[in-house]
Each structure stands twice: as structure tokens, then as C-alpha cells.
Regions:
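Domain-level signature for proteins that mediate thiol-based redox and metal-cofactor handling
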Residues: 1-162
């Protein structure tokens, strides 16, 4: 068990300005669309028209080459962009009760905005585009946020990857 990220988490697409060697190496493999880094995992999304059988061997070789004994865990600084009480409370619920469970499935969820009773969240990593994410969002995430932050009437997904 190797710690990949010491602090924070981060998602990369091919269009991002990338200066991390491990990210450049993974994107050197054709048909990789997205890479998401969290504490002890990396989630990689391939193009829809590609096959994991064609990518796995090359990706594993890259990861074994990059994540060696002297690998220094990545640090992604994260600061809250919200100053209102309700948004801060929503972030607290996400960070303490929801994100750890979502991370176990290779994804992440972040508050994008809160206005007039509607919390808009970003789905990242394996959660972005996952067929069951809508059900999880409405029956799990929304229910929990509404329980702890009664001002919230609805939680909606905002997916930047679609």
C-alpha cells in the first residue's frame, strides 16, 4: 500500500496544462481521457471506443515504473471557496461523511455551488459518467445532506466531463 497523494485530490484531462511526470506518462498511452488522483488510488478513464485489454499492460508498466520506493506523494492544496454558512456545512458533510465512501469506488464529489435550496455537486473520477451515480446521488448523497443541512431541498449533479 503506497500513499499516492499526501494532501488533497486532483483530476486531470488531456487538455490540462500538465507538469507532473506521472500524469504525462499515463497520458502517453493512447485513448486515456481522464486521470484522478486520491490518497491511495489512481482512477483512469479510457475513451469509450477503446478496450481495457489493449491498455492495461502498458498502464501497469508505467505505474510500476513511476510509483517506486522513492516516489514522493503528491500534494494538491485545497481551500474552501465558500464563505456562507450553508455551503460550509454542505462541504463538511461531503468531506466527513460522503467523500470517504465515494473514494472507495474510485471517485470524488465536490460542492460546486449552493443557491436557493439547491446544492450543485461535481462528480469526479470513476463517478463521472457512472450509470449508478444518479441513483447514488438522489438516494444517498441528497438524503444525507438534507438530513444534516435542512436548508437544502435538492442536490443536483454537474458533470464537467460530459
Amino acid at each position: 500500500d503506497k500513499v499516492i497523494v499526501e494532501e488533497g485530490s486532483k483530476e486531470f484531462t488531456r487538455n490540462d496544462d500538465i507538469n507532473l511526470k506521472i500524469v504525462k506518462s499515463i497520458f502517453s498511452v493512447n485513448n486515456i481521457d481522464l486521470i484522478y488522483f486520491d490518497k491511495n488510488f489512481i482512477s483512469i478513464r479510457k475513451a469509450k471506443d477503446s478496450d481495457w485489454d489493449d491498455l492495461t499492460k502498458e498502464l501497469l508498466a508505467i505505474l510500476n515504473q513511476e510509483i517506486t520506493a522513492d516516489f514522493k506523494p503528491l500534494i494538491f492544496k485545497e481551500e474552501s471557496q465558500f464563505d456562507d454558512d450553508i455551503s460550509k456545512r454542505i462541504e463538511e458533510v461531503l468531506n466527513e461523511k460522503i467523500r470517504p465512501a465515494v473514494a472507495m469506488d474510485g471517485g470524488d464529489i465536490r460542492l460546486k455551488s449552493y443557491k436557493d435550496g439547491v446544492a450543485e455537486v461535481l462528480l469526479k473520477g470513476a463517478c463521472a459518467g457512472c450509470p449508478s451515480s444518479t441513483v447514488t446521488l438522489k438516494h444517498g448523497v441528497e438524503r444525507m445532506i438534507k438530513h444534516y443541512v435542512p436548508e437544502v431541498n435538492s442536490v443536483e449533479a454537474f458533470n464537467i466531463n460530459e
